Design a protein with these regions (language model features):
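C-terminal segment of classical bacterial N-terminal signal peptides
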Residues: 16-23
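Bacterial N-terminal signal peptides that target proteins for export
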Residues: 1-10
Length: 431
């Protein structure tokens, strides 16, 4: 039954090899992915070389056989990515451990913990596969603790509070579907032996993992887009880095923010925050005096300004010391940041670009060694060879006992449900 359901759900999902949009001056900030491209499962394949990989994978052979035979998935060239294999195995383990339990609804009520007795405790015991009548004993405590750990319910304290009861009432099929969605996302990652080296940026976990011959050799925290300015799911080739980059302020911000700051702080704003003004967006545009610009007119105009405002390289620069460029028309790239303290808090706060926790370590990996430092601005440093960057979104991770669920900061799991399962209410057992 599960094979049939997954075939009907997944067979309708096609990979997207999207042609780039016409380039327009946008500054160093992302632009929205077109609404015609459905995010949640599919990548946008920006680079022609990546698109050719996509075409080879649009009709995978024996998808379900590989999924339910992880040994087969490891054999041969172009076998699915190891992340796919781990999540597929995790789905099996989840179904075996949690998918076979009785679907019993537990009514709302007080928190349940060790020593409690009553009808709701009996229902909780039955829901988790135990016989009624034993009360909230040590065995039930251990199972609730395990359930909380797998399903990302904090704190993991063995107490059946409101969140735990709500999760149990949601049913195992909801979570099995979430795993299946993540399995499908992982299938979009490169097959084994496709690339010697590549990077997976997971905006679901706000982490970047560096792969050599399909083995993760390093990982680091990253800051990614917020729920309003999501980092898109896409595959691109990183071709060069730029040392000591300028930050080009988007025309929208020049109109809405820069002009406002000039009104509030005067022309000293440019000196204090290391900005300069250029006549236009041309490659050889001259630097002009800010006092020659009618900032009041820019603020009130319905048109975007044609001048360019950019922040000079230095420790104050929003791009940090290095920017890793990946040609795409969505304005997405990886870069350093001067605000290292931000990595200790909420990491879903950027406008869509990816800020690296340790750009020096990252640069040392992509170049083979850290490039020689230079004081010259905008120094382009070609990579020895292009490095594929896969920007995905995973809300389930492999765990010691199958999988561990993580938050869904972009809400893409709910968005992907109808794409994959339509009106289906349940995901049948893999058994």
């Amino acid at each position: 039954m599960m094979h049939k359901l997954l075939c009907s759900g997944l067979g309708t999902i096609a990979l997207l090899a999207a042609a780039p949009l016409p380039a327009v001056p946008r500054g160093d900030e992302p632009v929205p992915v077109p609404r015609t491209i459905r995010q949640g499962i599919d990548f946008v394949y920006v680079d022609p070389q990546m698109s050719s990989v996509a075409r080879r994978r649009q009709r995978p052979q024996n998808w379900l056989q590989r999924m339910f035979d992880p040994g087969a998935a490891r054999r041969g060239r172009n076998a699915p990515n190891p992340m796919f294999v781990e999540l597929a195995r995790g789905l099996q383990q989840y179904q075996a451990r949690w998918g076979q339990l009785p679907e019993v609804r537990i009514p709302a009520g007080p928190v349940l913990k060790r020593g409690a007795r009553g009808k709701r405790v009996d229902l909780l015991r039955r829901r988790l596969g135990l016989s009624p009548g034993g009360g909230y004993d040590e065995q039930l405590f251990q199972i609730v603790t395990s359930y909380q750990g797998v399903h990302g319910l904090g704190p993991v304290d063995g107490i059946a509070g409101k969140a735990t009861i709500a999760s149990l009432n949601r049913g195992s099929d909801h979570y099995a579907r979430r795993i299946a969605i993540n399995v499908e996302r992982a299938f979009r990652l490169p097959p084994t032996r496709t690339f010697d080296r590549y990077v997976v940026v997971d905006s679901g976990a706000a982490e970047a993992r560096l792969f050599v011959r399909d083995r993760a050799v390093d990982e680091m925290r990253v800051i990614v887009g917020s729920a309003k300015t999501k980092t898109p799911m896409m595959a691109v080739l990183m071709r060069n880095a730029k040392a000591n980059p300028y930050w080009n302020v988007p025309p929208e911000l020049v109109k809405s923010l820069t002009a406002k700051k000039v009104k509030e702080q005067g022309l000293s704003y440019f000196r204090d925050f290391h900005y300069e003004v250029l006549a236009d967006w041309g490659a050889n545009a001259p630097v002009i005096d800010p006092k020659t610009v009618n900032w009041k007119a820019i603020a009130s105009s319905k048109q975007l300004p044609t001048i360019r405002v950019r922040q000079e390289p230095g420790p104050w620069n929003s791009m940090g010391e290095m920017k890793f460029e990946m040609p795409n028309d969505y304005g997405i790239y990886l870069h350093d940041t001067p605000l290292k303290e931000k990595f200790a808090g909420d990491r879903w706060i950027s406008n869509g670009c990816v800020r690296l926790e340790d750009y020096r370590r990252f640069a040392g990996w992509v170049f083979g060694r850290m490039p020689l430092e230079t004081s010259q601005p905008e120094q382009i440093i070609p990579l020895p060879r292009p490095v594929p960057i896969y920007m995905t979104y995973l809300t389930v991770a492999p765990g010691a006992y199958g999988v561990v669920f993580r938050p869904d900061p972009y809400g893409l799991d709910a968005q992907a449900m109808p794409q994959m399962f339509g009106g289906q209410d349940r995901l049948a057992s893999a058994a």
